[in-house]
Every structure is written in structure tokens, then in C-alpha cells.
């Protein structure tokens, strides 16, 4: 019980409380552009601006604090295969003070189920959820060479991850290396020997873009499903790599007393061409089923950051933003137009003609009759899972799943006839 002599201000400092509303959004795997607060805001801005017929500005996070004083020489970035690593950016930040994060960062992380650790780790997590770009920080003083290599090893190696577990690397694992010493499983999990600790004063901050297939293979092989791998597996925006790094660095300068002492290193071998699609206005009407005014179509496309080129009476050339990996065809563009226009605005005839075909599969008919007869006699039907645990499988030639969800469902269940024949 607090003394009555304590003022209200002190009580508020002791009992800090706030209310919040958390929205959980179920995303399909193809909507990698919306796996961030900024990405969701971008979509909401488009829908609300169109449906409310008013312009809403989308405000990007501030990087006004970003500035560097070049003291330290840059590290060399060596990417062995541009398919595996399309872009790699980095900064060296000095005078870091490891401490608790400010309340606004801790509150944001707690709200989305992430436990705050320290200001550096928290800022990388904060920016990842804010912008959708995973980041990783290394202790610069533990990097012994002047070259960061992004490569796969041809020979097996041992690697200790942040959780203290020693893992066997395969030749499919893409690694971030201190010359030839592995520091991190790229896009998935960091290493213990180069991690940030309470004694860290200088960090190398990484922002990169990795091949989704490569990341998924390693993630499933090592059973490491992280927030970082979740995003890389679905595809991360190449154009956002540098901005996210600057955003994190600006927060580190502001809240960790950091000082950037290098150039922004940017190795970009995997540049991609713009996607251009021709949109036929007649096809919009045919596919949707009713006519949408051309001015409304253009408004929707502009709100979605689709650049409109070469407009004629019957068609328009569309340039798709790089962060929209799911839009590759004309029908995808039409789907986006309808999504923002509103599925609820689809005009439906009042009369619906529904035809139900008669039952023609006689096998099912007799099976149902027999089932009804047997159940009336007190029999019970058993529908077994087609998967069982390895211990329960009595067959010597058991078929084992390579990546089962559980040890209890790791083998295919043989029928009694198949088991007898084998």
C-alpha cells in the first residue's frame, strides 16, 4: 500500500498502464508485402482513400537521425552466388550502450508477443515488424577478418547457434561468414560466437535479401522456424533493404547513443527488372462481371502504387511495384481492382438458377446402404489416420516421411493386405 503522501505523478510512474487493441491478420503466403505494420497500412490507405473518396497520406517511418562519421574502413562484402543472396547491406556502429529499450519499443513488442531483450535486439525486432525487413546485429570486435562472405560450404561443418545448440551444416545452408568462419545461418538464426552481449560496444548491422527456396530448405532441415525465416520464405522487398537498415540505425543513434563510423555498404548483384503488364479494360468488365468506370480503375491502380503508362481507350500499360510478388498477370491486376472496389459491390441477379445433378456413382450408393444396414445392427465404423508413429509401424519396409509434423505421425500406415504381402 502506498503512502497517502505520495503524489499522483509518482503513483502513475509506479503503476504504468495502457490499453491497446491487437488485430491478428490471417495472411495468405503470397501476400508477403503485408507482413508488416507499414504493409498493412499501405493496403488500408488504398482501400479507405478509395471507398471514402478522400486522400489519406501514407507516412513513412522517420530516418532523420541517420548520419555517419566515417572513421572505420568498410568491410568487404563477398557474395558467392547472386541467386542465393540478391542484396546485402551493412553498417558499423560504434559507442553502443547495451541497456533496456525505451518503453514505447518494449510496449510495442510485448503487444505482439515478443519479449524485450536489450535495446539492440529489440530495435531489430521492432523494425522487422514495422517494415517487414529482417535485420541482424553482430559484435564487430568478434569479426576477425575484413571480409564478410555469403556462401555455402561444400564440406560439412559444425555451428553453434544462439540457443547454444551445435548444428551440423549441410552444403544447402547459406551462411554469413567472417571470411570462412560461419557467423549466422542466413536469414534464419544467428551464431553464439558473434552475438551481441552486454559488453558489446561496436556492432555490424546487417540488412539483406535471400532466396526464399534456400531459406525454406535450411529452416525445415534444422527445424528453425523464426520470424526472420517466415518473411524470407515468402519474399522480402528488395527495394526496402537499405531503408530498413537506415531506420534501425537511426533508432540506435537515438536510443543506444550509437555513432555510425562507416559508409553504408551495399552489395546488390541480384537486381530485378520491372514487371510490366498490359491491362485491357474490356477484360476487367468480363472477368468481374460488371462495368467499373475507367477513372475509378485508374484511381485504384494509383492508390496501389501501380504506375500507369500508355493509356488508350481500350487498354493501359501497368508497372507493378517490386514489393508485390503476387501480381504477375493481367488477371492479378483485375483481382486487385476488385479487391479495393469491394467484393460486396459485385452485382448479383436476384434470381439464382441452381441445378443439382442426380447421384450416378452406384458404388457410393451401395456403400451407404451397407453402412446404414451395419450401423443399424450395432456395428461401428472406424476411420483410421493414414499416418502412425514409427514405433507403431510393424512393417520392415516402412515408409518414413522426410519432414513429419510430429513423431506420432511420421510413417505411412499399411493396410493389412499390404502388410501381409510384404
Regions found by a protein language model. Name each.
Residues 1-10, 414-422:
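Single conserved hydrophobic/aromatic residue that forms the stacking wall/gate
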Residues 3-363, 368-370:
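RNA/tRNA-interacting regions in translation and RNA-turnover enzymes
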Residues 98, 210, 387, 418-419:
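Hydrophobic pocket-lining residues within nucleotide cofactor-binding pockets
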Residues 354-359, 366-416:
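Polar, glycine-rich mid-to-C-terminal structural blocks
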Amino acid at each position: 500500500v502506498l503512502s497517502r503522501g505520495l503524489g499522483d505523478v509518482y503513483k502513475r510512474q509506479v503503476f504504468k498502464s495502457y490499453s491497446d487493441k491487437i488485430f491478428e491478420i490471417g495472411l495468405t503466403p503470397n501476400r508477403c508485402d503485408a507482413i508488416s505494420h507499414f504493409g498493412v497500412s499501405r493496403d488500408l490507405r488504398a482501400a479507405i482513400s478509395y471507398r471514402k473518396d478522400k486522400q489519406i497520406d501514407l507516412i513513412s517511418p522517420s530516418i532523420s537521425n541517420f548520419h555517419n562519421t566515417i572513421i572505420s574502413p568498410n568491410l568487404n562484402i563477398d557474395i558467392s552466388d547472386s541467386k542465393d543472396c540478391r542484396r546485402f547491406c551493412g553498417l558499423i556502429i560504434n559507442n553502443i550502450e547495451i541497456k533496456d529499450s525505451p518503453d514505447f519499443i518494449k510496449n510495442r513488442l510485448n503487444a505482439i508477443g515478443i519479449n524485450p531483450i536489450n535495446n539492440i535486439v529489440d530495435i531489430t525486432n521492432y523494425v522487422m515488424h514495422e517494415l517487414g525487413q529482417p535485420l541482424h546485429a553482430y559484435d564487430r570486435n568478434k569479426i576477425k577478418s575484413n571480409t564478410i562472405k555469403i556462401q555455402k560450404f561444400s564440406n560439412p561443418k559444425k555451428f553453434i547457434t544462439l540457443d547454444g545448440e551445435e548444428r551440423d551444416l549441410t552444403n544447402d545452408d547459406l551462411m554469413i561468414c567472417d571470411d570462412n568462419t560461419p557467423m549466422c545461418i542466413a536469414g534464419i538464426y544467428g551464431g553464439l560466437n558473434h552475438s551481441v552481449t552486454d559488453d558489446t560496444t561496436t556492432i555490424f548491422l546487417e540488412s539483406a535479401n535471400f532466396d526464399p527456396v534456400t531459406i525454406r530448405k535450411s529452416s525445415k532441415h534444422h527445424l528453425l522456424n523464426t520470424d526472420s525465416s517466415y518473411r524470407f520464405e515468402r519474399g522480402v522487398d528488395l527495394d526496402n533493404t537499405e531503408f530498413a537498415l537506415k531506420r534501425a540505425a537511426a533508432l540506435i543513434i537515438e536510443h543506444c547513443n550509437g555513432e555510425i563510423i562507416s559508409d553504408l555498404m551495399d552489395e546488390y548483384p541480384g537486381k530485378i527488372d520491372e514487371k510490366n503488364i498490359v491491362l485491357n479494360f474490356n477484360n476487367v468488365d468480363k472477368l468481374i462481371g460488371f462495368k467499373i468506370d475507367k477513372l475509378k480503375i485508374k484511381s485504384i491502380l494509383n492508390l496501389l502504387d501501380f504506375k500507369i503508362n500508355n493509356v488508350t481507350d481500350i487498354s493501359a500499360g501497368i508497372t507493378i511495384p517490386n514489393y508485390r510478388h503476387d501480381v504477375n498477370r493481367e488477371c492479378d491486376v483485375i483481382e486487385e481492382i476488385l479487391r479495393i472496389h469491394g467484393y460486396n459491390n459485385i452485382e448479383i441477379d436476384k434470381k439464382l438458377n441452381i441445378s443439382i445433378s442426380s447421384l450416378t456413382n452406384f458404388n457410393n450408393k451401395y456403400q451407404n446402404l451397407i453402412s446404414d444396414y451395419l450401423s443399424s445392427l450395432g456395428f461401428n465404423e472406424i476411420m483410421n489416420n493414414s499416418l502412425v508413429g514409427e514405433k507403431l509401424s510393424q512393417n520392415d519396409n516402412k515408409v518414413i516421411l522426410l519432414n513429419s509434423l510430429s513423431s506420432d505421425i511420421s510413417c505411412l500406415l499399411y493396410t493389412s493386405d499390404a502388410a501381409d504381402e510384404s
